[in-house]
């Protein structure tokens, strides 16, 4: 930690190279540094789809080698300034200058200063899986999409498409991650640790993302939820950064119920044939992350494609209704609904529809509750790895649903990433 006042800073300067430098060698004969950059210039390798469309994917990294003459002091100072600019570290100074807000200022949805009051009291972060912008929204005429790549367009995802008739369409939103192993870090920590990033593509410490138990897979600055907890804000975590302890069915058996069992249970519950879910206490989960364990809903499923998202929503809904009635809806709720990933028992189209319905139901319940006027719902993918996009493999759907998320024009093409959403 070079920011610590207790540690002498051994860094004399910084040299700009490629993305994710993983090794360096000094050529003493030529007085040069040779730096191997794991991700180099990023995922700019393109290929043509079966439809003849040039497209990109998150796995097409272009590694590079930087050959850098050993700089003198003046050149090193210039290089250091370039690194500072490349990494936008000047923005960190802007954040510091935005602190010191006035708690007595007039509340607005997004305060200009940290510490100013906000009209938003309840934040819901819905995490989904693996889709590019074009895969889901390529058929939306208002945005920069390619309809030929919209394999899960409006026919499979009518609810998220309907959202865009009222709320903003972001057609220039990106997930920095390659896949789940670093995607969950980007969402919850606003960065993937160096120890995680240079493992690409193996990720022996953190894959599959929410299942990591190694502290080296986490940023030392903490998580979105640990910061909320440190600020004394109530929060609940549904599925993120957790692992299963065991399954235990009502008859005492410890095998996992089938997808059909969970689905039938949800149908009966939603139709009023059951007052509670038969399998609601089947799952017991835990987390090795203390900030998660203290706020974890322990009967909510983790990443498991053998469980429909309707069951997840029904579990959350029971909890949400109790909180609404008691006036205890948390400030921050994280919900991981992942059937959009595909790979479970149903067909891919059915899994997309299951997830789309789940997202629609969550928004429907929140928007018809007494906390809607003070709520903001953020929806994003952990990564965009399982598809292609005609702009960039990292371009992904991102949604903000709130009384304060006003649609202005056909699309917002401002460059945003998961970091912007986490920061907001």
What are these regions (language model features)?
Residues 80-424:
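N-terminal pro-sequences and low-complexity stem/linker regions of secreted or lumenal proteins
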Residues 1-108:
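Predominantly soluble domains enriched in secretory-pathway, periplasmic, or organellar proteins
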């Amino acid at each position: 930690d070079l920011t610590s006042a207790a540690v002498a800073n051994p860094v004399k300067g910084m040299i700009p190279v490629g993305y994710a430098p993983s090794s360096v060698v000094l050529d003493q004969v030529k007085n040069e540094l040779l730096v191997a950059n794991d991700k180099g210039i990023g995922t700019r390798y393109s290929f043509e789809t079966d439809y003849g469309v040039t497209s990109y994917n998150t796995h097409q990294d272009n590694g590079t080698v930087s050959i850098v003459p050993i700089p003198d002091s003046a050149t090193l100072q210039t290089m250091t300034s370039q690194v500072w600019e490349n990494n936008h570290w000047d923005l960190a100074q802007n954040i510091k200058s935005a602190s010191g807000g006035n708690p007595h200022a007039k509340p607005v949805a997004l305060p200009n200063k940290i510490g100013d009051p906000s009209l938003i009291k309840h934040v819901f972060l819905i995490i989904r899986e693996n889709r590019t912008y074009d895969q889901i929204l390529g058929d939306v005429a208002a945005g920069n999409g390619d309809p030929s790549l919209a394999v899960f367009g409006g026919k499979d995802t009518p609810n998220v498409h309907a959202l865009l008739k009222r709320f903003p369409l972001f057609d220039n939103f990106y997930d920095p991650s390659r896949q789940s192993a670093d995607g969950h870090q980007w969402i919850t920590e606003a960065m993937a640790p160096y120890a995680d990033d240079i493992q690409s593509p193996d990720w022996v410490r953190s894959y599959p993302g929410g299942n990591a138990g190694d502290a080296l897979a986490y940023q030392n600055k903490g998580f979105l939820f640990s910061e909320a907890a440190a600020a004394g804000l109530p929060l609940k975590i549904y599925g993120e950064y957790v692992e299963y302890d065991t399954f235990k069915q009502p008859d005492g058996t410890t095998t996992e119920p089938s997808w059909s069992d969970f689905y039938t249970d949800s149908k009966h519950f939603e139709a009023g044939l059951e007052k509670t879910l038969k399998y609601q206490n089947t799952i017991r989960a835990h987390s090795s992350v203390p900030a998660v364990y203290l706020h974890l809903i322990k009967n909510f499923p983790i990443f498991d494609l053998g469980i429909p998202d309707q069951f997840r929503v029904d579990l959350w809904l029971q909890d949400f209704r109790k909180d609404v009635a008691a006036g205890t809806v948390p400030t921050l709720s994280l919900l991981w609904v992942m059937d959009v990933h595909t790979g479970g028992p149903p067909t891919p189209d059915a899994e997309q529809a299951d997830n789309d319905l789940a997202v629609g139901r969550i928004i429907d319940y929140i928007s018809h509750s007494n906390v809607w006027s003070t709520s903001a719902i953020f929806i994003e993918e952990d990564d965009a790895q399982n598809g292609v996009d005609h702009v960039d493999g990292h371009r992904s759907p991102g949604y903000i649903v709130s009384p304060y998320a006003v649609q202005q024009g056909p699309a917002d093409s401002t460059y945003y990433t998961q970091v912007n959403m986490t920061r907001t």
